[in-house]
From Swiss-Prot:
GO MF annotation terms: phosphate transmembrane transporter activity
One Pfam family here: BPD_transp_1
Domain spans labelled ABC transmembrane type-1: 89-297
The protein's name: Phosphate transport system permease protein PstA 1
Designated gene of the protein: pstA1
Keyword Glycosyltransferase: no
Length: 304
C-alpha cells in the first residue's frame, strides 16, 4: 500500500462495527445458564428464609415481652414464663469481649509480622499454623482448654476458660482479616515514608495501620460474630446460672447458647418459649454485629 493510499484512507469515515445477531443455539444456552444460576440462588435462599421465619414466628412473643431484655431467671420456676435473658446476654457479651481482648492484639501482631517482616521459613510455618487453627472444631478447642487450664493447671470452670477457647477460634479470623487489609495498603506509601527516613515500625504505626484500620475493625467484629453462638466451649468449660455472675474467673455464667441447651430439657411450655426467644435474641445479636461491620466498611469506602 502506497503512502498516498494510506493518507486517503484516513479521510474515509469509520465504518460502524456490525455485530452479528445471536444464534438460536447461543440464546438457548444463555437462557439455560441464567435459569440455572437464578434457581441455585433461590434454592440457597429458601433455607435461610425458612429458618428466619420459624425463629421469628416462635420467638417474637418472648423477645417483645416486658422484662425480656432487662431481667434474669433468678427465682423463676420452670413452669413460669417470667424473667428474661439479661443474664445470658451479659454472659455472651462478656465471654466474647474477654476473648476479643486477648485475641485481637495477638492476631494483629501476627498479621503485621506476616506482611511486614515474615519472609523465611518462620513465616511459612506461621501461615500453616493459622490455616490449621482455622479448621479446628470448637469442641476440640474446648477440650484442649479443659485439659490444660482445668485438668493440668487446676483452675476451675469459669467464663474465662470459655474465653480462652474462643480465643483459639477468633485468632485465625483476626489474623486473616488483618493480613488482607495490610496487604491492600500501597507499597508506594511505605517507600515514601522510608525515603523520608522514617523507621519501619513508625511507618507501620503511623501510616500503614491507620489506612488499614477500618477493614481490620470490620474483620474483628466478624470474628466476634463468629464466636458468640459457639456452644461446645460453654458446655464443657462453664456451668449454667440463673442469675448474673460478675466474676469471670470463678463460678458459673450463663450465655445464650447455654440457656437454649438448658431450657431444651424443660418440658413446660415456658421452656419452649424461652428456647425460641433466646434463639431469636442470638440471631439479633449476630445480625447487629454484622450490620456494624458492614457500616464500617461502607463509611471507609465512601471516605476513600
Amino acid at each position: 500500500m502506497s503512502p498516498s493510499t494510506s493518507i486517503e484512507a484516513l479521510d474515509q469515515p469509520v465504518k460502524p462495527v456490525v455485530f452479528r445477531p445471536l444464534t438460536l443455539r447461543r440464546r438457548i444456552k444463555n437462557s439455560v445458564a441464567t435459569t440455572f444460576f437464578f434457581t441455585s440462588f433461590v434454592v440457597a435462599l429458601i433455607p435461610l428464609v425458612w429458618l428466619l421465619w420459624v425463629v421469628i414466628a416462635r420467638g417474637w412473643f418472648a423477645v417483645t415481652r416486658s422484662g425480656w431484655w432487662t431481667h434474669s431467671l433468678r427465682g423463676v420456676l420452670p413452669e413460669q414464663f417470667a424473667g428474661g435473658v439479661y443474664h445470658a446476654l451479659y454472659g455472651t457479651l462478656v465471654q466474647a469481649g474477654v476473648a476479643a481482648v486477648l485475641a485481637v492484639p495477638l492476631g494483629l501482631m501476627t498479621a503485621v509480622y506476616l506482611v511486614e517482616y515474615g519472609t523465611g521459613r518462620m513465616s511459612r510455618v506461621t501461615t500453616f499454623t493459622v490455616d490449621v487453627l482455622a479448621g479446628v472444631p470448637s469442641i476440640v478447642a474446648a477440650l484442649f482448654v479443659f485439659s490444660l487450664w482445668i485438668a493440668t493447671l487446676g483452675f476451675q470452670q469459669s467464663a474465662f476458660a470459655v474465653a480462652l477457647a474462643l480465643v483459639l477460634l477468633m485468632l485465625p479470623v483476626v489474623v486473616r482479616a488483618g493480613e488482607e487489609m495490610l496487604r491492600l495498603v500501597p507499597d508506594e506509601l511505605r517507600e515514601a515514608s522510608y525515603a523520608l527516613g522514617v523507621p519501619k515500625w513508625k511507618t507501620i504505626v503511623r501510616i500503614v495501620a491507620p489506612i488499614a484500620m477500618p477493614g481490620i475493625v470490620s474483620g474483628i467484629l466478624l470474628s466476634i460474630a463468629r464466636v458468640v453462638g459457639e456452644t461446645a466451649p460453654v458446655l464443657v468449660l462453664v456451668g449454667y446460672s440463673h442469675s448474673i455472675n460478675l466474676d469471670v474467673f470463678h463460678g458459673n455464667m450463663a450465655s445464650l447458647p447455654l440457656l437454649i441447651y438448658t431450657e431444651l430439657t424443660n418440658p413446660e411450655h415456658a421452656g419452649f418459649l424461652r428456647v425460641w426467644g433466646a434463639a431469636l435474641t442470638l440471631i439479633i445479636v449476630v445480625a447487629t454485629i454484622n450490620l456494624a461491620a458492614a457500616m464500617i466498611r461502607f463509611v471507609a469506602t465512601r471516605r476513600r
